[in-house]
């Protein structure tokens, strides 16, 4: 089902991610950032809300001539070509948070990837543990790629397995599994069209 084309370590640059065209599934495992507002009592939307959520990519500390700084902001993510993309998994900290707009919801990476065309997303609501997240994702994909289970149900079953200690006692605390939530299409991933 998956024709994986990994971008690993120094290959996972902002420019390389921006060139990805309509992948069936896009999985980004990196660091996520969210800059809070200067007034935490007023988390409402501001003109820069889509600039406050970002993913850290390779070369973030290097000076760039082309304008890419190694941070893929939510605003930049809206310009990705994700039409036909069934699922985006943002396996990083704070990928589900953003500026809040009354009547509109959260402006952040989830909204950005939906605007770009992704049918569904798996996002996180707080800082996550690297090893626990890796183990959760491996089990999630094992269930998901079976083909008989929906995207949300695959995540739910994986989280229950961790809660019950079936993935190891160290993962029973919600910190390790409850951060990840689904958004969008909850149905099984359809067979990939050739």
Region annotations inferred by a language model:
Residues 1-194:
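Catalytic cores of enzymes
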């Amino acid at each position: 089902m998956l024709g994986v084309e990994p971008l690993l370590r120094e290959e996972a640059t902002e420019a390389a991610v921006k060139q990805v065209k309509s992948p069936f599934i896009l999985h980004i495992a990196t660091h996520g950032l969210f800059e809070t507002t200067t007034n935490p009592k007023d988390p409402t939307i501001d003109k820069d809300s889509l600039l406050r959520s970002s993913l850290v990519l390779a070369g973030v500390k290097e000076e760039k001539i082309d304008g890419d700084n190694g941070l893929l902001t939510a605003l930049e993510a809206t310009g990705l070509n994700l039409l036909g993309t069934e699922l985006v998994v943002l396996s990083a900290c704070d990928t589900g948070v953003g500026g809040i707009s009354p009547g509109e919801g959260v402006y952040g990476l989830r909204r950005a990837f939906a605007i770009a065309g992704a049918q569904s997303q798996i996002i996180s609501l707080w800082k996550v543990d690297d090893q626990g997240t890796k183990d959760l994702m491996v089990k999630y994909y094992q269930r998901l790629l079976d083909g008989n289970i929906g995207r949300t149900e695959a995540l739910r079953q994986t989280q229950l397995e961790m809660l019950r200690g079936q993935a190891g006692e160290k993962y029973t605390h919600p910190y390790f599994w409850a951060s990840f939530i689904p958004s969008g299409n909850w149905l099984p991933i359809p067979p990939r069209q050739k």
